């Protein structure tokens, strides 16, 4: 079982409440969203992996927001392409 000291992660994020939000969001991305961990898994739980990523400075709230926006833009572009292809097929 991995032991994690969250003090370094708290210092990276700013306060423990925001740390909980960021770590939970990242753990959910890894577990459900199919995102690859940025650190070695070492048989750790998703929350521990998220905390280790935060401690190492690989994940912040801003980074998560940026990645979400990029994914949303890519999805919107794909949807526009699909709609355009359908519209051109009807002509």
From Swiss-Prot:
GO terms for cellular component: DNA-directed RNA polymerase complex. SUPFAM superfamilies: RPB6/omega subunit-like (SSF63562). The keyword Transferase applies. Signal peptide: none annotated. GO terms for biological process: DNA-templated transcription. It comes from the Bacteria. GO terms for molecular function: DNA binding; DNA-directed RNA polymerase activity. Transmembrane segments: none annotated. Its EC number is 2.7.7.6. The RNAP catalytic core consists of 2 alpha, 1 beta, 1 beta' and 1 omega subunit. When a sigma factor is associated with the core the holoenzyme is formed, which can initiate transcription. Belongs to the RNA polymerase subunit omega family. Promotes RNA polymerase assembly. Latches the N- and C-terminal regions of the beta' subunit thereby facilitating its interaction with the beta and alpha subunits. NCBIfam families: rpoZ (TIGR00690). HAMAP family: RNApol_bact_RpoZ (MF_00366). This is DNA-directed RNA polymerase subunit omega. The lineage of its organism: Bacteria, Pseudomonadati, Pseudomonadota, Gammaproteobacteria, Enterobacterales. The gene is rpoZ.
């Amino acid at each position: 079982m991995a032991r994690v000291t969250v003090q370094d992660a708290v210092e990276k994020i700013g306060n423990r409440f925001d740390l909980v939000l960021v770590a939970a969001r990242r753990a959910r991305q890894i577990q459900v969203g199919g995102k690859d961990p940025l650190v070695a898994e070492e048989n750790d739980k998703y929350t521990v992996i998220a905390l280790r990523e935060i401690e190492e400075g690989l994940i912040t709230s801003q980074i998560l927001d940026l990645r979400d926006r990029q994914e949303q833009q890519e999805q919107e572009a794909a949807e526009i392409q699909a709609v355009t292809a359908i519209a051109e097929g009807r002509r």
